[in-house]
Amino acid sequence: MSRRHAAEKREVLPDAKFGDKVLTKFMNNLMIDGKKSVAERIVYNAFDRVENKIKRAPVEVFHEALDNIKPSVEVRSRRVGGATYQVPVEVRPERREALAIRWLIAAARNRNENTMEERLAGELLDAVQSRGTAVKKREDTHKMAEANKAFSHYRW
């Protein structure tokens, strides 16, 4: 690791339609090849689909879905005397959010619907109901941490 000071965290600007910084981070993660307008269109159209489906504010649904995906613990590899242990550690709040965003996008991309808007809307609706691939990823992460609880004294 570098011995210099850590890079400063840059603040993102809130998105144009809802004024939400987390949503901007989500769009930035969704964006491919710097095409932000495409990412925005996908998110806003997916939000319209969600709103039509369950008649709730889409930003609320988005945040509830993210809360259902955020992991509280994860495992990290630690070498101790020639053996590698999976040590459960608590996840920092910023990383929780980043992981939830990444997992939600990955799960949406792997779905079978035709357009990304449909896939994202479907994954958001599933996540709100604690179903779907992204929520399963979180459950698997928690199970791994639970299974390796015996090694938690190797925490650093």
UniProtKB/Swiss-Prot annotation:
One term under GO cellular component: small ribosomal subunit
Keyword Manganese in annotation: no
One Pfam family hit: Ribosomal_S7
Gene Ontology biological-process annotations: translation
Molecular function as annotated in GO: rRNA binding; structural constituent of ribosome; tRNA binding
Keywords, ordered alphabetically: Ribonucleoprotein, Ribosomal protein, RNA-binding, rRNA-binding, tRNA-binding
Claim: Ribosomal protein is one of the keywords in the record: yes
Role summary: One of the primary rRNA binding proteins, it binds directly to 16S rRNA where it nucleates assembly of the head domain of the 30S subunit. Is located at the subunit interface close to the decoding center, probably blocks exit of the E-site tRNA.
NCBIfam families: rpsG_bact
Family: Belongs to the universal ribosomal protein uS7 family.
Oligomeric and partner information: Part of the 30S ribosomal subunit. Contacts proteins S9 and S11.
Name recorded for this polypeptide: Small ribosomal subunit protein uS7
Source organism of the structure: Ruegeria pomeroyi (strain ATCC 700808 / DSM 15171 / DSS-3) (Silicibacter pomeroyi)
